UniProtKB/Swiss-Prot annotation:
Glycosylation sites: N108, N252, N416
Chain intervals with Basic residues compositional bias: 93-103
Name used for this protein in its record: Variant surface glycoprotein 7
Pfam families: Trypan_glycop_C (PF10659)
Record bears the keyword Membrane: yes
Length: 467
């Protein structure tokens, strides 16, 4: 029976790495003949028209998505690369492997490749607050289009070698002429895929910034004898990433809801960074987006959840406790400490340390904010408190010294908020109380210290971006 299109695509994917292209790609007549006799993809190994159509459809959503939040993505790409946080969850689909397009094979929206014309997964009726929450998620969500290259073994076919192949020559996808009689002439020859998101024209204009309709994903194929490598990188980085002996999988983000959410995140992020007076508390507290970001960082509601009245009260209390109740408190207690805080930033590939007040270039500010955000929100409680039942021993509890620090009471055993906040003793550095009523229970008040520090770095760096 006639193979299904899905079967054809899978067969073509498994076969495409077994072949090489000849330089006589100008022989359009031969390509046409190959397509005409394509009983099965593995027989003719070509059918470029079909492959290119799938290719353009698979990657059009990537171009659209990148354009939707390119400026924000560009600002956070380096910071994202500095973390161990998994930015993108990929679910490779065998039926979509091997689909890639060249710089000369731009998608044509008139052919139905636009995400707005695709069905499925639409998320509608979002409130403005929900849209602003996307700003927080943008920095650590799966909104990065990532090309994942998976190394695979190549099987050498006992077929006539293509005498015209130049092993170091680079080919565009549409230049390859897949000849059904040709296989890989040498086990050392590998297919190298290089991919990046580039400004028009092609690979000479730098990284995508979403300002040109022709910006998009660019793919190069090179036949080489280079050693196998495999990498994963955000396409928005601009720089090409290479792999060999590999197939290419692109995350499928064609649903309208993903595109809409990405646009909302982009707009929300721009509002968050539009801070005019970084030394004024009202600059932050008057912005509902900032409260949403605090809630996402400190209170950790489920992704996509709105701030309920109870949660909003907790957020407001957290802001008052950590940022100050008035302008004077904010400047003397919070801003002064923030400016003196030491943070990590990236200088090229090296991780370095500076005080926030000494960060100079926009790159330093962006990487510092991203590093603090990604690392800070995942930091566990740094120091465990001790059980107050050990107070009977003069060598423990309040009398016990370790490195000059007084041991703390076991806050989590206290069930009453008033009693919790009234515990006497030496509070953790930077905190007003020993214990705090946090997320509906009594906890060591240093519990949110790392989150507050991360938040302070993010706030200061965002503000400084404007200067």
């Amino acid at each position: 029976s006639e193979p299904t299109m899905s079967t054809r695509v899978q067969q073509a994917t498994s076969c495409v790495l077994l072949i090489i292209g000849c330089t006589n790609y100008a022989a359009s007549k031969q390509q046409t003949e190959n397509n005409a006799v394509c009983d099965t993809p593995c027989k003719c190994l070509g059918r470029l028209a079909v492959q290119k159509a799938y290719l353009e459809g698979a990657l059009e959503h990537a171009r659209q998505s990148i354009k939707a939040f390119a400026s924000s993505s560009r600002q956070h790409t380096i910071a994202a690369g500095a973390t161990n946080t998994k930015l993108s969850g990929h679910h490779p689909n065998q039926g979509r492997r091997g689909r890639r397009r060249s710089s000369s094979a731009r998608p044509n929206n008139s052919k139905g490749n636009s995400p707005s014309k695709r069905a499925g997964g639409a998320v509608r009726g979002e409130t403005p607050a929900s849209g602003r929450l996307k700003a927080a998620k943008l920095l650590k969500s799966s909104n990065y289009e990532t090309a994942t290259f998976t190394p695979t073994e190549m099987t050498i076919q006992n077929r006539r070698a293509c005498e015209q192949v130049d092993e170091s020559k680079e080919y565009r996808f549409d230049e390859l002429n897949f000849d059904k009689e040709q296989g890989i002439p040498t086990p050392a020859l590998t297919l190298e895929i290089s991919m990046g998101c580039q400004k028009n024209p092609g690979d000479t204009g730098g990284a995508c910034d979403g300002t040109n309709a022709d910006d998009g994903v660019v793919t190069k194929l090179t036949f080489t004898t280079a050693a196998p490598v495999a990498e994963t990188s955000p396409l928005v980085a601009g720089a090409y990433k290479k792999t060999s002996k590999a197939s290419l999988s692109i995350s499928n983000r064609t649903e309208e809801g993903r595109v809409a959410n990405s646009k909302a995140a982009h707009e929300a992020a721009k509002r968050l960074m539009a801070i005019k007076q970084p030394s004024d508390l009202s600059t932050y507290t008057d912005d509902s987006s900032f409260a949403l970001l605090v809630g996402q960082l400190a209170m950790k509601p489920p992704l996509g959840a709105e701030l309920t009245p109870a949660l909003r009260d907790q957020v407001n209390k957290f802001i008052t406790d950590n940022y100050g109740a008035n302008e004077g408190d904010f400047r003397s207690k919070f801003l002064a400490k923030t400016e003196q805080a030491a943070v990590f930033y990236l200088d090229g590939k090296s991780k370095k340390t500076k005080k926030i007040s000494e960060l100079e270039s926009k790159s330093e500010l962006v990487t510092a904010s991203g590093y603090a955000f990604f690392k800070g929100i995942h930091t566990e409680q740094a120091e465990k408190v001790e059980n107050p039942r050990s107070q009977g021993n003069p060598e423990t509890a309040e009398n016990k010294k370790e490195g000059g620090n007084t041991a703390k009471p076991f806050c989590s055993t206290i069930q009453n908020q008033t009693e919790c906040e009234g515990v006497k003793g030496t509070p953790p550095t930077g905190k007003a109380k020993v214990c705090g009523w946090i997320e509906g229970k009594c906890q060591d008040s240093s519990f949110l210290l790392s989150k507050q520090f991360a938040l302070s770095v993010v706030s200061a760096a965002f503000a400084a971006l404007l200067f």
